[in-house]
Amino acid sequence: MIKALLPVVAMLLLLATPSSTPFAQPAPLPAGLKAAIDGPQRDPANRLRDRYRHPLETLSFFGIREDMTVIEISPGAGWYSEILGPLLREKGKLILAGSASPALRARVADQSGMLGKAVLLDFRPPDFSLKSDPTQTPQGADMVLTFRNVHNWISAGTVQTVFAGMFRAVKPGGILGVVEHRANPALPVDAKAANGYVHETQVIAFAEAAGFRLAARSEVNANPLDTKDHAAGVWMLPPTLRIDPAEREKLLPRALATGESDRMTLKFIKP
């Protein structure tokens, strides 16, 4: 998975402000957003995660619209993709870049299905040559989104490169939306983000070093129950529940009661 993240930059290079406010109000809801979230195309297991991931509030906060070209970086199994696809299929465009599960690849291949005309950009290490869709927007995307991936880039040593690539991917005035597991600010920064948590100040610094400006931050994905001191890191919590079998009886109830991790939700603008 980590190897697939470096080539994202090659794709981003091909795609061609408001002052920072502490907690801005979300933009008006696109008409089709709630319909996409409530739609029958979604996996029932994914719906169960809405209580922790707040897709309606999160995407509204980022200011998504149906007519945008949106890049989702490292979509994985497509938790957000199955919302973004129906939302953008008529007037906009969805580009999925980086690692994607076989099931998500199959859904992209079915152009008549849930993801419609979505494009999956594939990469071929070690030369990272891009096999891209010639119809993709050359002047840049309206929005780049990434959900719970920054710790992987830190661990791989590619975080500055990826943020620089995301900056090049969006047009001036374009948006970068980031959701990430949030570290305890009282603890030292872990240079490898080994437990999956990242300091909010780190993410802001990475984005600003690439050229973005922080537009707003939201607490919509905050979880004050998360103590962030788990032996297996963030993966001890749902949905992974990576718990030592010898400790499972004791720790599983705690993990389930906590829910998913405490997360930062940050919106950046390209000047």
Predicted regions and their residues:
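C-terminal lobe and adjacent flexible extensions of AdoMet/dcAdoMet transferase-like proteins
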Residues: 251-271
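A short acidic, Gly/Pro-enriched loop at the edge of an enzyme's catalytic core
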Residues: 131-144
